[in-house]
Amino acid sequence: MIASVRGEVLEVALDHVVIEAAGVGYRVNATPATLATLRQGTEARLITAMIVREDSMTLYGFPDGETRDLFLTLLSVSGVGPRLAMAALAVHDAPALRQVLADGNVAALTRVPGIGKRGAERMVLELRDKVGVAATGGALSTNGHAVRSPVVEALVGLGFAAKQAEEATDTVLAANHDATTSSALRSALSLLGKAR
């Protein structure tokens, strides 16, 4: 497999770049953001994923290994092929897409052309636990984002209204950024029990 390509940029098109390496021109599909960093006549290096099909071998290029790994993770979802995975990475960069998946943000996923509500829900279900999220220093810690969705889902499963569950979970996570899923669930249940 071809893991990376380095060489002179011969052509930059709307959806791909041609990079000459050792006398061979490699056509590498890439997102608009990646293509915008490349200039004809300059040297470039892209981390690649090679997708082999019965009738084709296609290279997809990425600025770093993290983005390539996320692309390959997206392909593990039933119904998500290389084009759809690239579309997702064109709309959301890798850190943002990881955050969207970790948060279970179906609305953000449906902004990707070709991903409907059902497809977005399937992606969240299959990938939420597979994608790690880098620390961001936002209002909620990374742990808070990762813990919030499962706690809210558990509370809704126990019969609480979604709004009630979200408010209780947010209150608990605001007070304790480092709460685990189980401790946050216990605290939220305690809070909701007092409210009843």
From Swiss-Prot:
* Any one GO cellular component localisation term in the record: Holliday junction resolvase complex
Location(s) in or outside the cell: Cytoplasm
Q: Per the UniProt entry, what are the Gene Ontology biological process annotations, in alphabetical order?
A: DNA damage response; double-strand break repair via homologous recombination; SOS response
Principal cellular location given in the protein's record: cytoplasm
Q: Which GO terms describe its molecular function?
A: ATP binding; four-way junction DNA binding; four-way junction helicase activity
A Pfam family per the record: HHH_5
Which InterPro entries does the record associate with it? DNA_helicase_Holl-junc_RuvA_I (IPR013849), Hlx-hairpin-Hlx_DNA-bd_motif (IPR003583), NA-bd_OB-fold (IPR012340), RuvA (IPR000085), RuvA_2-like (IPR010994), RuvA_C (IPR011114), RuvA_C_sf (IPR036267)
**Region Flexible linker: start-end pairs:** 139-148
SUPFAM superfamilies this protein is in? DNA helicase RuvA subunit, C-terminal domain (SSF46929), Nucleic acid-binding proteins (SSF50249), RuvA domain 2-like (SSF47781)
Q: Which UniProt keywords apply?
A: Cytoplasm, DNA damage, DNA recombination, DNA repair, DNA-binding
**Assembly with partners or alone:** Homotetramer; forms a dimer of tetramers with an internal space large enough to bind the Holliday junction DNA. Forms an RuvA(8)-RuvB(12)-Holliday junction (HJ) complex. HJ DNA is sandwiched between 2 RuvA tetramers; dsDNA enters through RuvA and exits via RuvB. An RuvB hexamer assembles on each DNA strand where it exits the tetramer. Each RuvB hexamer is contacted by two RuvA subunits (via domain III) on 2 adjacent RuvB subunits; this complex drives branch migration. In the full resolvosome a probable DNA-RuvA(4)-RuvB(12)-RuvC(2) complex forms which resolves the HJ.
What is the protein's given name? Holliday junction branch migration complex subunit RuvA
The scientific name of the source species is Mycobacterium tuberculosis (strain ATCC 25618 / H37Rv)
Lineage here is:
Bacteria, Bacillati, Actinomycetota, Actinomycetes, Mycobacteriales
